[in-house]
């Protein structure tokens, strides 16, 4: 396997190697767009004096939430949308939709058709819900590692909706290059879960540093985004 690529075991004959060097310019452009959109959304939210504060959930809240009867999604959405004016929602929604498109474009660039799989949400299918909640791609580590130290590394994408049918989401799945050398490939994956912002650092050199926990970074409201998250490839 080439040192500047990563290899995926797809449980079939042979492997798929992705050479990242060929994508470096395009990835750089996309990441700049994503960073710009993130800053834009953050600035929009910072200008809202009535933006609700989000406190970390405690264990008691988590337990009681599990046993609490769910209200209809429409009443929840109505309460949340009442916080914002129509103009504010429209602005945030446009920014969020553009950001979402750029994230999909980045994923399609990093992981071609052979790796990305379309996920179709069927609310009656428990397995599909699980896949939507956490999509994991498994890769082999750098071939320079000793055989006994080889491990399967993961890029984990988690999408936190709270209620899958509710039109409220948090900023999802930013994947960026931290560094790339002939022997080390570092990929950062960010996601939000249970009101916390997580970053996973995956190092392709027999080492892995995972999950740096931060406070929630961004919340945006979208009335038009497709939360089935069907990846277009």
Swiss-Prot record:
Changing residue 202 to A: Decreases propensity to stall ribosomes. Changing residue 209 to A: Decreases propensity to stall ribosomes. Acts as an endogenous target of the ribosome quality control (RQC) pathway. During translation, the nascent chain has a propensity to stall ribosomes, thereby stimulating activation of the RQC pathway. Residues 196-212 are annotated as: The nascent chain stimulates ribosomal stalling during translation by interfering with the conformation of the peptidyl transferase center (PTC), and the translating mRNA by adopting a difficult-to-decode structure at the ribosome decoding center. It comes from the Eukaryota. This is Uncharacterized protein YEL057C. Changing residue 204 to A: Decreases propensity to stall ribosomes.
